[in-house]
Amino acid sequence: MSGRRIKLRLSAALVAAGALVALAAWPAYLSGKTQLGSRAAAAVAVKPDWRVRDANIAFLESRAGRVRGDMLTPRMLATEYLQRYRERGDIGDVQRAERAARRSLAAQPRGNIAGEASLAGVLLTLHRFREAKAAVLRARAWRRDDAGLAAEEAALDLELGDVGGARRIIATFPEDTAFDVVAARLDEETGHLDDARARVARAMARADTIYDTPAERRAWLHARSGELALEAGDVAAAGRATGEALAIFPTHLRALTIAARVALANGDLPAAEAQAQRAVAIQPNPEVLGLLGDAQSARGETAAAAATRDVLLAVARIGDALHVNDRLIALWEADHGVRVDHAYGIARRDLAVRDDIYAEDALAWTAARSGRWAIARESIAKALRYGTHDPAILRHAAEITAHLDASDLSPAVIPRIRAMAAN
């Protein structure tokens, strides 16, 4: 399996990382209950909020610490830092956001709902999911009926592999638009891809009518729409959606990554290489480096592909002290037969952090590639237990079941696995 099939999963969070919790920080975006009519409202102009991000941060930094007991300024700083991370990919901004959020909570430990939500967004981005859920639960203790906070808890349940818990929370808020993105994630994991696409389309259309929606958030939704379209095999729709995302925010990392995958699916190698290069310039993570190397290799650019591979290996060897790229590194190493025992160890560590279907898939694939077939069989069965249609998981399942019998798998998934194996 090539690097292009590595998928950066964000839950509500995504994606990228921290998407749902981030969205919950924008009440106008998530908390409204008004449904779109039969005809979607016209999209409004994009707010160029990223242009004043540095100025906003500089101003807030100049005010921080001036007033004893100030909980508002550090909380606002945390929000701005985290948003700048999503726009530019500097993990240092996430660390700054954590310090700011904790200063806000130190100033007002009780009832600081926004401070807890900010901290949860940071911790989710850092893949410290259990700590993030604890912060959300503290916030919900003060505001139990808040749909945005409930959506955050459901998103974290999905990250932790608690599909039942997420489903129960979502059912408590039927038809609330605050849940469109996280419910779409649930639909995706449980094999209801058409429903997932419809929910994201509704969230996207709604966000596009609200001027105060951050440009990066709007682009993320269009990119997410493209990701789901690509997962469904609708390459044309995926291309349109990523084009829209990049028109909204031209340097959106997730949109560029998906655009590179779309170009590879279309056989447009120059475009795939160009989009991957743009993504690498923002954040050289294992996924985009893998895509770039694939495109370069396919174009016969041997020296460039070797250089990209060296960079990726350096990233994998140095590792990520914060472990936010663990799964990507494990999958890339397994795909390319590089340090497969190391990849398996990373996948085991990732599973201990969040036991969702993608963690089980990563463990299954790294186990298979390192010859641990019994573990591969057990883990791929867990990855498939909710009926996902994810092509990468099905491809892994096809290769694993080719070496083992499929008696542990649900009969419903066998035809999809066989179809994937035939292709």
Residue ranges and their predicted role:
Residues 9-10, 18-114, 125, 134, ...:
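N-terminal leader/linker segments that initiate helical-solenoid repeat arrays
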Residues 63, 103-104, 138-139, 169-173, ...:
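Canonical positions in the second alpha-helix
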Residues 112, 118-121, 217-220, 313-385:
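Alpha-helical adaptor scaffolds
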Residues 53, 87, 91-94, 129, ...:
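TPR-repeat structural position
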Residues 84, 88-91, 126, 160, ...:
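Structural motif corresponding to the intra-repeat A-B loop/turn of tetratricopeptide repeats
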Residues 79, 83-86, 121, 155, ...:
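Residue-level recognition of tetratricopeptide repeat
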Residues 71, 108-115, 142-150, 174-182, ...:
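Generic helix N-cap/helix-start motif at coil->alpha-helix transitions
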